[in-house]
Swiss-Prot record:
The species this protein was found in: Pseudomonas savastanoi pv. phaseolicola (strain 1448A / Race 6)
GO biological process: protein modification process
GO CC, one annotated term: cytoplasm
The name this protein goes by in its record: Octanoyltransferase
Subcellular location per the Swiss-Prot or TrEMBL entry: Cytoplasm
PANTHER family recorded: LIPOYLTRANSFERASE 2, MITOCHONDRIAL-RELATED (PTHR10993:SF7), OCTANOYLTRANSFERASE (PTHR10993)
UniProt main location, coarse: cytoplasm
Domain BPL/LPL catalytic stretches: 31-206
Length: 218
């Protein structure tokens, strides 16, 4: 069991700032570098993964579209969505890609169960769903045995922009969020519960709070 998983709470941050910092963190880390999770929210943005197709961007309007290097297709990020970027040395952890995805999905399913929400994964469509509606998305990149990008959980946000795309490449895919399933919730509490579940499901002994920003990576 790895000793500690470090968490850096960055608040509301521009998507491209976080993305480029993730790339530099991953490219510059040594074999002994500690793993980190960055917890963020983003201003409104669509991101198009490596499998993305232009026809799945229906009416983006004034929301910017960023082509990125993660797996998957198009998704939306906005305030009220909890995004966790997972910078993990998966070789050191001994995880295969499928195993890592399953562990992340199980993390989210357990978190939602804490709020009395019954969720499930789908074998052919990564992410987590409640009664067929998607509540959390996954998108990862593995480089030199290390992961970056991560998960996005809809907590309490404006879901309208999802109707401007085919989320994750699926036309008409319904989206939902935790506040619609569990009523009034505290975003900070959801974040704290996510931290605990990630530590458990990724086999770390404990969590650590990291201070400082990521400006030295951008």
């Amino acid at each position: 069991m790895t000793v500690a998983l470090g968490f850096r709470d960055l608040g509301l941050i521009d998507y491209e700032t976080a993305w480029h910092a993730m790339q530099r963190f991953t490219d510059g880390r040594g074999r002994e570098a500690a793993d980190e999770v960055w917890l963020v929210q983003h201003p409104p943005v669509f991101t198009q993964g490596q499998s993305g197709k232009a026809e799945h961007l229906l009416l983006p309007g004034n929301i910017p579209v960023v082509q990125v290097d993660r797996g998957g297709q198009v998704t939306y990020h906005g305030p009220g969505q909890l995004v966790a970027y997972l910078m993990l040395d998966v070789r050191r952890l001994g995880f295969g890609v499928r195993d890592l995805v399953t562990r992340i999905e199980n993390t989210l399913i357990a978190l939602l169960a804490d709020y009395g929400v019954k969720a499930a994964a789908k074998a052919d469509a990564p992410g987590v769903y409640v009664d067929g509606a998607k509540i959390a998305s996954l998108g990862l990149r593995i480089r030199n045995g290390c992961s970056f990008h991560g998960l996005a959980l809809n907590v309490d946000m404006d879901l309208e922009p999802f109707r401007r795309i085919n989320p994750c490449g699926y036309a008409g895919l319904a989206m939902t969020q935790l506040s619609d399933q569990a009523g009034q919730i505290e975003f900070s509490e959801v974040s704290a519960r996510l931290r605990a579940q990630l530590v458990k499901h990724l086999d770390y002994a404990e969590q650590a709070t990291l201070t400082g920003g990521i400006n030295h990576y951008d």
